[in-house]
Amino acid sequence: FTTQETITNANTAKQWFLKSAKDSKFVANHFVALSTNAKLVQEFGIDKANMFEFWDWVGGRYSLWSAIGMSIALNIGFENFEHLLSGAHWMDNHFKSTPIERNIPVILAVLGIWYGNFYGAETQALLPYDQYMHRFAAYFQQGDMESNGKYVVRAGDKVNYSTGPIVWGEPGTNGQHAFYQLIHQVPHHPCDFNSPVKSHNSELRDGLHHTILLSNFLAQTEALMKGKDRQTVEKELKAAGKSEDEIKSIGPHKEFTGNRPTNSIMVDTVTPFTLGAMIAMYEHKIFTQGIIWDINSYDQWGVE
C-alpha cells in the first residue's frame, strides 16, 4: 500500500467499483489485501479479516513464496502452488546440504564471478528453449540486478570491482534470429541455456516442434563451445561451389573462435515443481554472489 503503481491501480479499481456499489462500506466485502500494513489496509476500506499478511522483511523479488503468491495459487490452483513451493524447498535443501563442489547454485555463482570479475563479462543471458518460460529472463532481471547491482559493500565503502551483471534474454529460436550473432562472434557474454526434455505439446506433429527446439538447443551450445575455424569454413564453401575469390571474401565473416561460456540446464518437463526449483536455484546463486562480493542482496536503495 506504499508502492505507487500498486496503490494507483487499487484506487482505480475502487473508483470503478464504487460507480456501481455507490457506498464505500461495500469495499470491505469485495476487496482483499496482501500487505504488511494493517493500518493502511483499513484506511483503504478493506476488512482486516480479509488481509493476508507476510513479514515486512520479505522483499518483492523474493515474495512469491509468501502470501504474495496468492495470485499464482488462484491461477494454477493451490495444489500446483504447493508443488511450486515443494520444488523450491527441494532446491533449498540441496543448497543447504550439498558439498560446494556439487552445489548447483554455488557453481553458478562462482562461474558468474569468474566470468565477470576475471574476464570482464558485464552481461548474463538467460535463454529458455520452451515458450512457457518466455518471461523467465525478464523475471530475473529484477531478481538479479536489483539484488546485486550495488555501489557499496555492507559496511558502506564503495566497491572497487564489478558486482551484478546486466541480465537479458529471449526464448528459444526467437533469440537466434535476434542476437545470437553477437554471442557467437563477440566474446564475454556468458549464457545459461535451459530446456525441458519433454514438451507439453508433444502431440503437435508427433513432437516435431520440440525436436527442432532441442536440436537447436544442443547445436547452439556446441557451436558456442567449438566455434568454426577458417579451414572448416573454406572446406564448406568449396563444397558449396564457391570460387577461390568468393571463399577469400566470405571466409573471414563465417569464422568464429568458439570458447564462449555457456551452462546447459535441463529438466524432464516444465512443471510447478521444476519451475520452483529453478527459481530457487537462481535465488541462491544471487545470494551466494552477494556474500562473496560483500554486498547486501536484500536491499534496493537505488530504487527507493
Swiss-Prot record:
CDD domains noted in UniProt: SIS_PGI_2
InterPro entries referenced in this protein's UniProt entry, alphabetically: G6P_Isomerase, Phosphoglucose_isomerase_CS, SIS_dom_sf, SIS_PGI_2
Any one biological process term the GO annotation gives: glycolytic process
Major enzyme class: isomerase
Keywords of this entry: Cytoplasm, Gluconeogenesis, Glycolysis, Isomerase
Positions annotated as active site in the UniProt record: 146, 177
Functional pathway: Carbohydrate degradation; glycolysis; D-glyceraldehyde 3-phosphate and glycerone phosphate from D-glucose: step 2/4
UniProt family annotation: Belongs to the GPI family.
Designated name of the protein: Glucose-6-phosphate isomerase
Native organism: Calanus finmarchicus
Gene name per UniProt: PGI
